[in-house]
Amino acid sequence: MSLAARRKVRIRLYGTNPADVEQVAREIVDLAKKMGVQVKGPIPLPTRRLVVTVRRAPSGQGYHTFDHWELRISKRLIDIEASERVLRRLMTIRVPDTVKIELQLI
């Protein structure tokens, strides 16, 4: 295999369910190791925490009570040395709806 045909791929996984993100990351790493390519990761990135504070009483009258809603976004980063064969196998992995994937050629 020539050097031009071999590239690095950076895979970013993110989602609201940390268990699903971890499972997909584990499947990608297992697949890459099984195919014999070099893998770095999964690297856990900081969890993003989105908080929304809303007033309970819509009219503005009465006690000042508030609800707090929170959404946590877990992220993982995986770098693999991938050929076309490996990328085709990556497309066959089942990904839950709660996990989003970004691929970037480096």
Swiss-Prot record:
GO BP: translation
Entry keyword set: Ribonucleoprotein, Ribosomal protein
Gene Ontology terms, MF aspect: structural constituent of ribosome; tRNA binding
One CC-aspect GO term: small ribosomal subunit
Gene3D superfamilies in the cross-refs: Ribosomal protein S10 domain (3.30.70.600)
Superkingdom, natural source: Archaea
One Pfam family in the UniProt entry: Ribosomal_S10
Family: Belongs to the universal ribosomal protein uS10 family.
Quaternary data: Part of the 30S ribosomal subunit.
Its biological purpose: Involved in the binding of tRNA to the ribosomes.
Designated name of the protein: Small ribosomal subunit protein uS10
Organism listed in the record: Pyrobaculum islandicum (strain DSM 4184 / JCM 9189 / GEO3)
Gene behind the chain: rps10
